[in-house]
Regions:
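Eukaryotic phosphotyrosine signaling hubs
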Residues: 5-7, 73-76
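Conserved beta-strand in the GNAT
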Residues: 53-55, 121
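Core segments of cupin and vicinal oxygen chelate
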Residues: 2, 9-52, 93
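Short hydrophobic/aromatic beta-strand micro-patches
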Residues: 9-11, 78-82
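A short, acidic/glycine-rich surface segment
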Residues: 38-39, 60-65
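Exposed loop/turn and edge beta-strand positions of beta-sandwich/beta-sheet ligand-binding modules
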Residues: 39, 73, 106
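Short amphipathic alpha-helices within nucleic acid-binding modules
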Residues: 21, 85-90
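Vicinal oxygen chelate
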Residues: 88, 92-126
Protein backbone atom coordinates (compact mmCIF):
# COMPACT_ATOMS: atom_id res chain seq x y z
CA UNK A 1 0.00 0.00 0.00
CA UNK A 2 1.24 3.49 -0.86
CA UNK A 3 0.11 6.61 0.97
CA UNK A 4 0.78 10.11 -0.34
CA UNK A 5 0.00 13.43 1.29
CA UNK A 6 -2.74 14.99 -0.85
CA UNK A 7 -3.39 18.28 0.95
CA UNK A 8 -3.30 20.19 4.19
CA UNK A 9 -5.66 22.95 5.31
CA UNK A 10 -4.50 26.25 6.85
CA UNK A 11 -6.41 29.19 8.25
CA UNK A 12 -5.14 32.43 6.71
CA UNK A 13 -6.26 36.08 6.66
CA UNK A 14 -6.78 36.34 2.89
CA UNK A 15 -6.78 33.10 0.86
CA UNK A 16 -6.63 34.91 -2.49
CA UNK A 17 -3.60 37.00 -1.49
CA UNK A 18 -1.83 33.99 0.04
CA UNK A 19 -2.50 31.91 -3.08
CA UNK A 20 -1.14 34.75 -5.24
CA UNK A 21 2.28 34.82 -3.56
CA UNK A 22 2.42 31.00 -3.57
CA UNK A 23 1.77 30.98 -7.33
CA UNK A 24 4.52 33.59 -7.84
CA UNK A 25 7.10 32.01 -5.51
CA UNK A 26 6.50 28.28 -6.06
CA UNK A 27 4.95 28.26 -9.55
CA UNK A 28 1.80 26.59 -8.26
CA UNK A 29 -1.68 27.02 -9.70
CA UNK A 30 -5.10 27.61 -8.20
CA UNK A 31 -6.98 24.31 -8.44
CA UNK A 32 -10.28 25.50 -6.94
CA UNK A 33 -11.73 28.36 -4.94
CA UNK A 34 -15.08 29.23 -3.47
CA UNK A 35 -17.32 29.31 -0.43
CA UNK A 36 -16.18 26.95 2.33
CA UNK A 37 -18.48 24.29 3.77
CA UNK A 38 -18.39 25.86 7.25
CA UNK A 39 -18.67 29.44 5.98
CA UNK A 40 -15.83 31.69 4.95
CA UNK A 41 -13.77 31.23 1.80
CA UNK A 42 -11.20 28.68 0.58
CA UNK A 43 -8.59 28.58 -2.18
CA UNK A 44 -6.82 25.34 -3.15
CA UNK A 45 -3.33 26.11 -4.52
CA UNK A 46 -0.63 23.63 -5.49
CA UNK A 47 0.38 21.15 -8.16
CA UNK A 48 -1.58 18.53 -10.07
CA UNK A 49 -1.34 15.99 -7.25
CA UNK A 50 -0.88 17.97 -4.01
CA UNK A 51 -2.13 21.27 -2.69
CA UNK A 52 -2.67 23.54 0.29
CA UNK A 53 -6.24 24.47 1.20
CA UNK A 54 -6.16 28.12 2.31
CA UNK A 55 -9.20 28.89 4.46
CA UNK A 56 -10.46 32.17 5.91
CA UNK A 57 -13.36 31.90 8.38
CA UNK A 58 -16.02 34.57 8.58
CA UNK A 59 -14.89 35.54 12.12
CA UNK A 60 -11.21 34.65 12.57
CA UNK A 61 -9.56 34.52 15.98
CA UNK A 62 -6.01 35.76 16.54
CA UNK A 63 -3.18 33.24 16.66
CA UNK A 64 -2.40 31.73 20.04
CA UNK A 65 0.87 30.58 21.55
CA UNK A 66 3.92 29.45 19.59
CA UNK A 67 3.09 26.42 17.47
CA UNK A 68 6.28 24.72 18.67
CA UNK A 69 4.90 24.81 22.22
CA UNK A 70 1.32 23.81 21.36
CA UNK A 71 0.26 20.19 20.95
CA UNK A 72 -1.21 19.87 17.46
CA UNK A 73 0.42 23.14 16.34
CA UNK A 74 1.80 23.56 12.85
CA UNK A 75 5.55 24.11 13.09
CA UNK A 76 6.43 24.67 9.43
CA UNK A 77 5.66 23.62 5.87
CA UNK A 78 8.52 22.10 3.88
CA UNK A 79 8.64 22.80 0.15
CA UNK A 80 11.12 21.03 -2.16
CA UNK A 81 12.41 23.17 -5.05
CA UNK A 82 14.84 22.63 -7.93
CA UNK A 83 16.63 25.98 -7.60
CA UNK A 84 17.05 27.26 -4.05
CA UNK A 85 18.71 30.54 -5.03
CA UNK A 86 16.02 31.46 -7.58
CA UNK A 87 13.30 30.61 -5.07
CA UNK A 88 14.97 32.73 -2.39
CA UNK A 89 14.99 35.68 -4.80
CA UNK A 90 11.25 35.18 -5.36
CA UNK A 91 10.65 34.97 -1.60
CA UNK A 92 12.45 38.30 -1.15
CA UNK A 93 10.54 39.85 -4.07
CA UNK A 94 7.29 38.78 -2.37
CA UNK A 95 8.36 40.83 0.66
CA UNK A 96 9.38 38.01 2.99
CA UNK A 97 12.71 37.72 4.85
CA UNK A 98 14.63 34.42 4.52
CA UNK A 99 16.45 33.18 7.63
CA UNK A 100 18.16 30.10 9.11
CA UNK A 101 20.11 29.22 5.97
CA UNK A 102 21.93 25.89 6.26
CA UNK A 103 23.76 23.32 4.19
CA UNK A 104 23.26 19.72 5.21
CA UNK A 105 23.41 16.28 3.65
CA UNK A 106 21.87 15.92 1.14
CA UNK A 107 21.08 19.57 0.34
CA UNK A 108 20.55 23.19 1.35
CA UNK A 109 17.67 25.06 2.98
CA UNK A 110 16.30 28.31 4.33
CA UNK A 111 13.17 29.37 6.18
CA UNK A 112 10.79 32.32 5.94
CA UNK A 113 7.60 33.42 7.67
CA UNK A 114 4.66 34.60 5.58
CA UNK A 115 2.26 37.38 6.53
CA UNK A 116 -0.02 34.86 8.28
CA UNK A 117 2.77 33.82 10.65
CA UNK A 118 3.21 30.46 8.91
CA UNK A 119 6.82 29.31 8.71
CA UNK A 120 8.03 27.70 5.48
CA UNK A 121 11.19 25.64 5.02
CA UNK A 122 12.46 25.69 1.44
CA UNK A 123 14.88 22.90 0.56
CA UNK A 124 16.83 21.75 -2.50
CA UNK A 125 18.64 18.43 -2.64
CA UNK A 126 22.02 18.08 -4.38
Amino acid sequence: MTATLEHTNFTVRDPKATAAWMRDVFGWKTRWEGAAIAGGYTVHVGSTHTYLALYAPENPRPAGESSYDTVGGLNHVGVLVDDLDATEAKVRAAGFKPHNHADYEPGRRFYFDDDNGIEFEVVAYD
